[in-house]
Amino acid sequence: MFLNKLIKNKYKQNFFSFKNYCTINNNKPLNGFKILDLSRVLAGPYATQIFGDLGAQVIKVENVGKGDDTRQYGPPFYVDEQGRKGSAYFSCANRNKKSIALDISTKEGQDIVYSLAKESDVFIENFKVGGLKKYSLDYETIKQINPSIIYCSITGFGQDGEYSKLPGYDFSVQAMGGLISITGDKENPYKCGVAIVDMMTGLYANIAIQAALHHREKSKDKKGQYIDVSLLDVQASFLANHGSSYLVTGETSERVGNSHPSISPYDSLKTKDGFMVVAIGNNTQFQSMCNVLGLPHLSTNPLFSTNPSRVLNRKQLLSILTNETLKFNTDDIVKLLGDSNVPCSPINSIDKVVNHKQIKHRNMIWNLPLNENNNNNLNNNNLNNNNSNNNLNNNNNNNKNIQNDKGEYIMNSINLIGNPIHFSETNIHTPSSIKSNIPPPFLGQHTDEILKNIGLNENQILNLKNNNIVQ
């Protein structure tokens, strides 16, 4: 078969074209690395999106038909001018990737993965333990094709142990890993507002892969390795002071709402028109807060003069402070306290965050045309700091709020929250660098391009499509 012939010929062609991948700026720190992404949902895709943001080439392998599960997560959904459909959920972790849709249960589909893996630096997946072995896409098989590859598996509970075969989801691991037990008020445990375990697992996976790449570059034989990352391990690792406190005392932490078990006042406080938070870290900050609120005597009161005493008398202290903060509008009291170097902030809704002047100043909202060919024509005003105070609804996407009869948002470009890393020498937040990003791909958007880059002609690609092997 023609794909087997490609493998025997040792894949003389590169699996992906540098020229086609990045339209403007290829001076990003991970430029040159090639990532083959068979993961889906959030943890794996978040890890590979970071690679893409930093300049690596990422190919996302998806199922024929439905693709990544998160393509169905919604509403909200959006469509571009060509009627191609995307989901807001999918878009949060899948920019800077190119999508190929193929059936890995077929020999032809597996051969395509082999040809891509041959030229890849990294292979990442989050199937159940052993899930890819039945498709001959497990580490032992892939490393025979490419001994230098870094192969990362993300699972709920790791590759071994009695829980290893169980499916793992962020919500269940937040519960099993103790996070929900310390989140919420005394009566009601709550999950985090975002899938924090998935996100942290993606970060750990990315760190682990970069460490393995560094080790490979230093080693004489340039040998790759296998990486096993699990959601439960990650959740346990960031129990932080709650975990260490138990290991010291043998006592578990109680839920204290927005309070801190060891610091006070470190809490949310009501204001005249909403809520604010204060995060007092030392006695000097507490004294400053008391002075602003007209309570200078409070900082010398033995009940509140030290942090341990404030923790013991937390309820009484918060009642006194709230009586004063209720006299102010949120913005006013936050400014007064901030001017006195008291750590505090309003509790912002999402719209206030993405339109915040500091977020805009830092170029943290990236506007990407859904048609990649329009990258060079992207209006710099969307990216220029001079316009950072403009509201997103009026600035980046005039069609943002228009919906069709299916409730889908009609969009020519998409706003995304950008990568938070700021480099001095390889700045990924300049207008030209932001313009070089590619939007979250539609399912199979780059199938033809990728297959042509591994040597297939149009007739061969059409044959694969007719047999539902690729899309």
Swiss-Prot record:
The active site is at D198 (nucleophile). Its EC number is 2.-.-.-. Residues 376-404 are annotated as: Disordered. Pfam families: CoA_transf_3. CoA binds at K128. One of its GO terms (molecular function) is CoA-transferase activity. The keyword Transferase applies. Keywords: Transferase. The keyword Transmembrane does not apply. Residues 376-401 have a biased composition (Low complexity). Belongs to the CoA-transferase III family. This is CaiB/baiF CoA-transferase family protein DDB_G0269880. It comes from Dictyostelium discoideum. The lineage of its organism: Eukaryota, Amoebozoa, Evosea, Eumycetozoa, Dictyostelia.
